[in-house]
Amino acid sequence: MTPTPRVPNDGVVRIFRGKGGRGGKAVSVVHGLPRRDLAAVAKDLKKHCGSGGTVKDGAVEIQGDQREKIAERLRAQGYVVKLAGG
């Protein structure tokens, strides 16, 4: 299992690709969103990407490597987005 990346609280939304503990399947993990927005953003991203996802440990997880789609969607909503990690 890969450890959760430490994310600074600087107002930037970071999107990681992870697959640890998921049988080798990739997920896109979105850190840095305000807690009050997590559920609504997760629902919107799942619909936009056409895949499943969840809110876990203060982050949104979307199934598959959807980082580009997620970044595009969040930028359109006014977030400052950075692709991070592999």
Predicted regions and their residues:
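Long, charged, low-complexity intrinsically disordered regions
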Residues: 1-43, 47-48, 54-56, 68-86
